[in-house]
């Protein structure tokens, strides 16, 4: 379960960064 959580957070963090940058470019 531990490694599964780490993989989830890593994947979500990458997506969140892309979305954040996209948001800045749009404004």
Swiss-Prot record:
Keyword Hydrolase: yes
PROSITE patterns: GH18_2 (PS51910)
Subunit structure: Homodimer.
Organism lineage: Bacteria, Bacillati, Actinomycetota, Actinomycetes, Kitasatosporales
MF term (GO), any: endochitinase activity
Presence of keyword Hydrolase: yes
InterPro entries linked to this entry: Glyco_hydro18_cat (IPR001223)
Organism: Streptomyces olivaceoviridis
EC number: 3.2.1.14
Catalytic reaction equation(s): Random endo-hydrolysis of N-acetyl-beta-D-glucosaminide (1->4)-beta-linkages in chitin and chitodextrins
GO biological process, one term: polysaccharide catabolic process
Function, as annotated: Able to cleave chitin oligomers from N=3 to 6.
Keywords: Carbohydrate metabolism, Chitin degradation, Glycosidase, Hydrolase, Polysaccharide degradation
Family the UniProt entry places it in: Belongs to the glycosyl hydrolase 18 family. Chitinase class II subfamily.
Name assigned to this protein: Chitinase 47 kDa
Residue span, GH18 domain: 3-27
